[in-house]
Amino acid sequence: MNKGPRHRPKFLSKKGKKLRIMVAGSSYTSYQACINSLCSKQILEAETEIDPLKAHIDRILEIREFNADILEDEFHVDLTVIEVNGFGDKIDNSASFEVVTHYLESQFDQALIEESKIKRNSKFTDTRVDALLYFIAPRGHCLSEFDLEAMKRFSKRVNVIPVIGNSNAFTEEELKNFKDVIMKDLKQCNIKVFDFPWDPEEDEDEVIEDNKRLWESVPFAVSGGVSEEDEEGYQRIVKKFQWGTFVIDDPAHSDFLNLKTVLFISHLDILKSITKQTYYENYRTEKLSNDSPSNTSLSLQKQNSIVANEDKRSVNGSERTETRSSIDQSEMRTNVSDSTKSEELKKINSIKVDNTSSLKCDSYGNTKTKTNQLNCEQIGLEVISPKEFPHRTTSSRNSLPNNTTKELEMKKMDDLSHERYENLPFYR
């Protein structure tokens, strides 16, 4: 009879190796009791009592974390158990996939953000999930569509380890047949679970044989129980029934010891390495490739244009101020000139109104008024009539017409004195 794990480390770490495992499965699998038995302490609490008044209400899907420091003779592990409470307990469980997948990807996002920083945080806590224990209900026929879809989605982001809960419900032959059906369904649906990889060129023969034996045990058939001493004084995890006692950590009864060895001793580092080098790198590649270069270039061009516009605003701010001041000054001058012109136009219009209101004829038949003359004197204009224009000799502009008139008068007098009437138009 196997009393414990086969793999024993050479030394134990004082702080314990960090391990983060997620547990998903319906409440009918009794996964809480199994996890408590693996950790040898009470971590998860199963709901043994159900309120009849709330039995018809769907349970809320919750993701809860529990920490436990597990120290035994063979290992020391700083364990974090992530429980998906209420998984698969609803009538419609379609939204459960997205909740779990979003949680797994969120842990990758945190690592990606920290990795892209120029100055990284030395105290950054890696929260990526190293393994997911998917508990399968002991139906005995085949995997449900829900189980197949769940493992297919989760296997893209984490190491999925299928586990049969409450395996004590099967006989030895029934359990073997159920395992064969599960592995056949996984293969037909191309669902990749943790397959205990080995390298024939690097790994020793003993390691290869152990990995093959563990792979043949998948899915692991386990149950939960309580610890008590047997007749020989060994601490055993048992589950008592009326027909007898089911020894959980007996390899002849269940795969409990194999699962415990895989998680805490033999494959702990391998699980963490595959999480970082395979699942995280695949997610990182998908995340960066989804950001198309065209969108990235457009966003960069937009940012550059915004920066250029800001620079132009800062550089040309003074020029716009000077231009605006010059425009204001020109507008002021224009307003002054416009106001002056408007005043003159008002005066001229007032003159026209006065002329039309009170018209008088002078001795030459011209229309003159005192107001007209007064307004003309105010604006500096000289108003004369056509009849008095030839008789004006004071102005230099009238010198040419006055001289011409005198010559014509003298010529007329000469023609009359010599009786040259043909030159006089009024004698023809």
UniProtKB/Swiss-Prot annotation:
Query: Could you tell me the superkingdom of the organism this chain comes from?
Result: Eukaryota
Q: What InterPro entries does this protein map onto?
A: G_SEPTIN_dom, P-loop_NTPase, Septin
UniProt-annotated binding residues for GTP: 25-32, 86, 166-174, 224
Query: What residue spans carry the region label Disordered?
Result: 287-345, 387-414
Biased-composition ranges, Basic and acidic residues, are 309-325
Ranges for the region named G1 motif are: 25-32
Instruction: Please state every residue range assigned to the domain named Septin-type G.
Output: 15-290
Compartments, record wording: Cytoplasm; Nucleus; Forespore membrane
A molecular function annotated in GO for this UniProt entry is:
molecular adaptor activity
Cellular component terms (Gene Ontology): cell division site; cytosol; mating projection septin ring; meiotic septin complex; membrane; microtubule cytoskeleton; nucleus; prospore septin ring
Query: Residue spans with biased composition (Polar residues)?
Result: 290-307, 326-339, 392-405
Entry keywords, A to Z: Cytoplasm, GTP-binding, Lipid-binding, Meiosis, Membrane, Nucleotide-binding, Nucleus, Sporulation
Its placement in the membrane is given as:
Peripheral membrane protein
Please give the residue ranges the record annotates as the region G4 motif: 165-168
Q: Where is this region: G3 motif?
A: 83-86
GO biological process, alphabetically ordered: cytoskeleton-dependent cytokinesis; protein localization; spore membrane bending pathway
Q: How does it assemble?
A: Component of the sporulation-specific septin complex composed of at least spn2, spn5, spn6 and spn7.
Q: Which family does it belong to?
A: Belongs to the TRAFAC class TrmE-Era-EngA-EngB-Septin-like GTPase superfamily. Septin GTPase family.
Q: What does this gene product do?
A: Septin-like protein involved in the correct orientation of forespore membrane extension during sporulation. Binds phosphatidylinositol 4-phosphate.
Query: Per its record, how is this protein called by name?
Result: Septin homolog spn7
